Amino acid sequence: IFNKAYRKVLGQLSARKYLHSLMHSDGIFTDSYSRYRKQMAVKKYLAAVLGKRYKQ
């Protein structure tokens, strides 16, 4: 009985660790993607501002 309960707990813990690792890798991708989008927005803004200055 103890061994069966112990295996069940270990199985739950390993499943949680697996899900946590999936969420972690997804978080890293999302963080990198949002950082990339912010950089693109800044570049676009600077191009618009500097482009207007050069045209004047």
Curated annotation (Swiss-Prot):
Keyword Secreted carried by entry: yes
Natural source organism: Heloderma suspectum (Gila monster)
Residues recorded with modification Leucine amide: L50
TM stretches of this protein: none
UniProt GO BP: adenylate cyclase-activating G protein-coupled receptor signaling pathway; insulin secretion; neuron projection development; neuropeptide signaling pathway; positive regulation of cytosolic calcium ion concentration; positive regulation of ERK1 and ERK2 cascade; positive regulation of gene expression; positive regulation of growth hormone secretion
Main location (coarse class): secreted
One of the record's GO cellular component terms: perikaryon
Gene Ontology MF: a single term: type 2 vasoactive intestinal polypeptide receptor binding
Entry keywords, A to Z: Amidation, Hormone, Secreted
Job description of the protein: PACAP is a neuropeptide involved in diverse array of physiological processes through activating the PACAP subfamily of class B1 G protein-coupled receptors: VIP receptor 1 (VIPR1), VIP receptor 2 (VIPR2), and PACAP type I receptor (ADCYAP1R1). Exerts neuroprotective and general cytoprotective effects due to anti-apoptotic, anti-inflammatory, and antioxidant actions.
Subcellular localization(s) per the UniProt record: Secreted
Subunit organization: Interacts with ADCYAP1R1 (via N-terminal extracellular domain).
The protein's name in its UniProt record: Pituitary adenylate cyclase-activating polypeptide
Family per similarity comment: Belongs to the glucagon family.
InterPro entries found in the cross-reference section: Glucagon_GIP_secretin_VIP, VIP/GHRH-like
Region (Important for receptor binding): 42-50
Pfam families: Hormone_2
